[in-house]
Structure formats: structure tokens, C-alpha cells
């Protein structure tokens, strides 16, 4: 789906169409969710609407038993896994939260249903030598503007831990004059500051010299060859092309740089609260998952270095 907004089909009920629009606006404007997240929530809602039409249920009169029936239907027809169930339930809870706020329903029927918590996967990150290999790689066209941009983009991703949607929406006027600090708008429209190291600043400075001459009026920092802002899909494509040129089997994704950023900070002794702030996590528990990665590295060092551990 990439950056392309999901389009709801036109339903027979006009109130249904208006309700869907209110929900999408809430996700987009108030929650500041990425387009990919909005697409996923939209598809979840589409499934639910279709189920309600099929069963002749009124969206505004739904009971908890109807929500249970819906998930039983999904499990039987689509065989969705636990992770998908949890997200679809989250979508419905958010949807009815909006309806409740608009006084369109009396209660939220989705709050009375729960699934066992999905175990969070340990994030995958690059090893230090892998990160260096990606950053130091130079293609045959290293002097081209697009290559200079790509190098700056990768340095920024690793130096700051930005989410990909934060990267593509980053504005030039939110960047400090010395290029070391950037103000970003993250999830839930939460503002935070991220910081760039020497390598990122140097690469960014080189890229901006070209970018500002070619497209001085553009708002976003990272642009395509037509002067339009890069899309999240475009960033993923660029990284995948770099992977191919390097001859790598491993994937290179924006989120992997974010994971590596967090893990490397914790490995170096950074306070977890500071890492939480830099990543823009609202909950410390989200950041704590990186500790398990860091602990595994410590165990590995111990096993290799301690005389008795090697026996």
C-alpha cells in the first residue's frame, strides 16, 4: 500500500460513509498516524462494515456479543492470526472511541473483548561492522546528487533513530542552523528533538548544497529528482537498491536503523529514559524491549571472553 491512501468503497448508508471519514480524519489529524497505519486501520474497518451489512447490523447499535461474532467470523473465514486479531480489535476500539466522543453511540462495545497479549518480537538490528559497511559503501555513481542524498538519508536514519514517516515529513525550517538538531512531529502529534552526529551533519551539509540550489522553495528536507518530498515507499526502495548493489542477502529497512540506533545507545550505557525520549516512545515498556537485545550481546561477550564460559 505504501503511501497511497486506502479508498473506502461507497456504502449504501450515507451515515456510514461520513462515520468512516470522521474516523480517518481522527487518525490523520489528531493521532498523526503514518499513511501505512491509516491504511491498515481503514482495511480493518472495511471488513467490519461489510460484516455488519451482511448480518444487517446497525453500526450505531452494536453490542459486545456482535463484536465477538465478528471475530468468530474472521477466524473461520480468513483464519487470521493473533497479531492480526489484536490489531483489528484495536482498530474497532479506536473507531468506537471516536463515535462515543461524537455522541453517536452510548458505549464502546469493543472494550469488553480482549485477546491474549501478543509477545513482542525482539527487534532486529545491524551489527556495528554491518552498519559501517552500509554507511561506507560507495556505488559507481557516488558523485551523483541522488547518491549524495541517499548517503545523507542513511546517516540521518542511523544518527537519529527517526521513524520513516518522520524522515520524509522532516521540514528544512525545523533544522537548526548548524544542522545538529531537528524538531520532528511524531506519533500522536508529539513533538520531540533528535540529534545528528558529525558524520550525519557532514553528509547532510553536502546534500543540502545541491538541494537548496535546485529546489530552494521546497519544504521537506529529502526530495526526489522532481523536487517533491520522498515517500516512505521511495525510502524503502532506495535502501533495497543499495542492498542489491552491495550484494547483501540481509534486508536493509528504515526501522532496522531505528532499532540499531536504540541498541547501540543502550550498549554504550545510555539511560533507558533518555533513549525513550529520543525514540519518541510514549511508553517505557516499548523501549525496554531493546534491553533484551543489549543483554543478549552482553551474554555473547561473556561466553566468548570468560575462561570458564568457554569450557
UniProtKB/Swiss-Prot annotation:
Residues 121-303 form the Tyr recombinase domain. Keywords: Cell cycle, Cell division, Chromosome partition, Cytoplasm, DNA integration, DNA recombination, DNA-binding. It is found in: Cytoplasm. GO terms for cellular component: cytoplasm. GO terms for molecular function: DNA binding; site-specific recombinase activity; tyrosine-based site-specific recombinase activity. The active site is at residues 163, 187, 255, 258, 281, 290. Its main location: cytoplasm. It comes from the Bacteria. Signal peptide: none annotated. InterPro entries: CB, DNA_brk_join_enz, Integrase-like_cat_sf, Integrase_catalytic, Integrase_recombinase_N, Integrase_SAM-like_N, Recomb_XerC, Tyrosine_recombinase_XerC/XerD. Residues 14-100 form the Core-binding (CB) domain. GO terms for biological process: cell division; chromosome segregation; DNA recombination; DNA transposition. Site-specific tyrosine recombinase, which acts by catalyzing the cutting and rejoining of the recombining DNA molecules. The XerC-XerD complex is essential to convert dimers of the bacterial chromosome into monomers to permit their segregation at cell division. It also contributes to the segregational stability of plasmids. Forms a cyclic heterotetrameric complex composed of two molecules of XerC and two molecules of XerD. Belongs to the 'phage' integrase family. XerC subfamily. This is Tyrosine recombinase XerC. It comes from Leptospira interrogans serogroup Icterohaemorrhagiae serovar Lai (strain 56601). The lineage of its organism: Bacteria, Pseudomonadati, Spirochaetota, Spirochaetia, Leptospirales.
Amino acid at each position: 500500500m505504501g503511501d497511497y491512501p486506502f479508498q473506502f468503497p461507497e456504502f449504501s448508508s450515507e451515515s456510514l460513509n461520513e462515520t468512516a471519514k470522521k474516523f480517518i480524519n481522527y487518525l490523520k489529524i489528531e493521532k498523526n498516524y503514518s499513511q501505512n497505519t491509516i491504511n491498515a486501520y481503514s482495511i480493518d474497518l472495511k471488513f467490519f462494515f461489510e460484516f455488519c451489512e451482511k448480518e444487517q447490523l446497525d453500526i450505531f447499535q452494536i453490542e459486545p456479543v456482535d463484536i465477538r461474532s465478528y471475530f468468530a467470523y474472521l477466524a473461520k473465514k480468513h483464519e487470521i492470526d493473533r497479531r492480526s486479531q489484536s490489531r483489528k480489535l484495536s482498530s474497532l476500539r479506536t473507531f468506537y472511541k471516536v463515535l462515543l466522543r461524537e455522541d453517536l453511540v452510548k458505549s464502546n462495545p469493543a472494550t469488553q473483548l480482549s485477546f491474549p497479549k501478543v509477545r513482542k518480537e525482539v527487534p532486529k538490528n545491524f551489527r556495528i561492522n554491518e552498519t559501517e559497511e552500509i554507511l561506507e559503501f560507495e556505488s559507481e555513481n557516488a558523485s551523483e546528487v541522488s547518491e549524495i542524498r541517499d548517503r545523507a538519508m542513511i546517516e540521518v536514519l542511523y544518527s537519529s533513530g527517526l521513524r520513516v514517516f518522520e524522515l520524509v515529513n522532516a521540514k528544512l525550517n525545523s533544522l537548526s542552523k548548524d544542522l545538529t538538531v531537528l524538531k520532528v512531529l511524531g506519533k500522536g502529534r508529539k513533538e520531540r528533538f533528535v540529534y545528528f552526529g558529525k558524520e550525519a551533519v557532514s553528509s547532510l551539509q553536502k546534500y543540502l548544497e545541491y538541494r537548496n540550489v535546485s529546489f530552494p522553495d521546497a519544504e521537506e528536507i529529502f526530495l526526489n529528482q522532481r523536487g517533491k518530498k520522498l515517500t516512505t515507499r521511495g525510502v524503502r526502495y532506495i535502501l533495497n537498491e543499495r542492498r542489491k548493489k552491495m550484494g547483501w542477502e540481509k534486508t536493509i529497512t528504515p526501522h532496522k536503523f531505528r532499532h540499531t540506533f536504540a541498541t547501540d545507545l543502550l550498549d554504550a550505557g545510555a539511560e533507558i529514559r533518555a533513549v525513550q525520549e529520543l525514540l519518541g516512545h510514549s511508553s517505557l515498556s516499548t523501549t525496554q524491549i531493546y534491553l533484551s537485545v543489549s543483554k543478549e550481546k552482553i551474554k555473547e561477550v561473556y561466553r566468548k571472553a570468560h575462561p570458564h564460559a568457554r569450557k
